[in-house]
Amino acid sequence: MDRAAIAADSDSGLADLSIYLAAGEGKLDPSRKPDFVKKALTQDRILRLESKGKGSLVVTSCFGCGANKSWDTTLTIVWRGGKFLVAGYSRDWDWNVQKADGSVETTLGGCDINFLTGRGVASKDLDDGKPVAGKFVPIALADWSDDSRPEPCEF
């Protein structure tokens, strides 16, 4: 059985992901070093770390977490070809900006990119998601950063 853990770096406050392969069923030996560490996976608040079907690991985080300016992000990680890959990326946002005249401008949207199939959808406002142009390919988890976020997932 594999294990994963998220911990905030004491200096930066960024979330570091540690993965332990073949960790067994019992308690994890605290002296064991992780098989893989992704430093600074996200600066957002981690909501969930889940194991999904076919051996994927899903990390869900949020910025603002329901505030006037917020988004949530889901990163799907898989083990393929001897390395960890980002297989999927989803992001939903609700961004409210108070204007000088007192009105509020709201930007809603979302994206869902499957790097394994090379396809994705994006939505703006309350529209249904539409396929996005481009070919998406898996990204090594070691190379992932917020700068790797696909263009359709920007707002």
Residue ranges and their predicted role:
Residues A4, P34, T42-D44, T60-C62, ...:
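Sparse, context-dependent recognition of short Cys/His-centered cofactor- or disulfide-binding micro-motifs
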Residues G55-F155:
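Acidic, small-residue rich beta-repeat scaffolds with periodic aromatic anchors
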Residues L14-K33, T76-G81:
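Beta-propeller blade repeat segments, especially FG-GAP/WD-type strand-to-loop junctions
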Residues T42-K54:
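Beta-propeller blade termini
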Residues E25-D44, A133, P138-A140:
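Blade-edge motifs of beta-propeller repeat domains
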Residues M1-A8, K52-F63:
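Acidic/hydrophobic-patterned starts of short beta strands in beta-sheet-rich repeat architectures
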Residues S10-A15, N68-W71:
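Short, solvent-exposed loop/turn segments at conserved positions within beta-propeller repeat blades
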Residues A4-G13, N96:
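Short, charge-rich amphipathic segments
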